[in-house]
Amino acid sequence: MNIWDIIVAIILGIVEGLTEYAPVSSTGHMIIVDDVWLKSKELLTPEAANTFKVVIQLGSILAVAFVFKDRILNLLGMKKNITEEQKSGNRLSIAQIAVGLVPAAVLGFLFEDYIDQYLFSVRTVAVGLIAGAVLMLAADWINRRKDTTDSVDRMTYKQALGMGLFQCLALWPGFSRSGSTISGGVILGLSHRAAADFTFIMAIPIMMGASLLSLIKNWAYLSADLLPFFIAGFISAFIVALFVVRFFLRLINKIKLVPFAIYRIVLGLLLFILFL
């Protein structure tokens, strides 16, 4: 392990932190990086590389949990009335989050082996990037024609279920969990900020659970000589994700989804040109 390896870990953590919660697909970007960098440089064994991805994803998840710490405490009954909506009697509930989680959890369980075997390639990521961009452009167009629910505390169970169904699209690498779910929320009548809030809150339990299970499963690959590599990636992913989530939430109602859609289309077309 040398200083260059640590720099690589930091760069990969930055990629994860930048893309995990922006609607551009962190999985897609990590597959691309894995294909054109990790595999070609042979920095890690395949098993250690997969464990590293889990570690940096955990860093980005903990960052969003930190951003929403007051909301999490509120959901657990440990903090009261953190928004004006809650003071008037409206409140996002754990039940709504559970309703949103069920569809993707069921489909992911049923088709996990198929997804792992057939959908994790640069070509499928390119398809997901472009298809997700089309969905995002459609969501912004629909959003211009209707009034929106501007607070996550006012969303309905129907909207929560609908966003959960849209989240199923993210099982295809490249679609993006946040891109699919925020687009779905906007189509269903939420403001961009309210849809983003629910998307991030809903992601915390399922991604935290999946990451911890994967980490336990791959614990043997956390060897002492790789520990500096893993720690560097974890810290960089946490710090970058912290800034990205806060920045994204401040701006999403103003910039909408179009800039992200344009980026996805350009990247998807570039991947088709380079890898087809």
Curated annotation (Swiss-Prot):
Bacitracin is thought to be involved in the inhibition of peptidoglycan synthesis by sequestering undecaprenyl diphosphate, thereby reducing the pool of lipid carrier available. Catalyzes the dephosphorylation of undecaprenyl diphosphate (UPP). Confers resistance to bacitracin. The keyword Coiled coil does not apply. It comes from Bacillus licheniformis (strain ATCC 14580 / DSM 13 / JCM 2505 / CCUG 7422 / NBRC 12200 / NCIMB 9375 / NCTC 10341 / NRRL NRS-1264 / Gibson 46). One of its GO terms (cellular component) is plasma membrane. This is Undecaprenyl-diphosphatase 2. Disulfide bonds: none annotated. The keyword Cell wall biogenesis/degradation applies. It is found in: Cell membrane. GO terms for molecular function: undecaprenyl-diphosphatase activity. Its EC number is 3.6.1.27. It catalyses: di-trans,octa-cis-undecaprenyl diphosphate + H2O = di-trans,octa-cis-undecaprenyl phosphate + phosphate + H(+). One of its GO terms (biological process) is regulation of cell shape. It is a multi-pass membrane protein. Keywords: Antibiotic resistance, Cell membrane, Cell shape, Cell wall biogenesis/degradation, Hydrolase, Membrane, Peptidoglycan synthesis, Transmembrane, Transmembrane helix. It holds the Pfam family BacA. The chain crosses the membrane at residues 3-23, 48-68, 92-112, 119-139, 196-216, 225-245, 255-275. It comes from the Bacteria. Belongs to the UppP family.
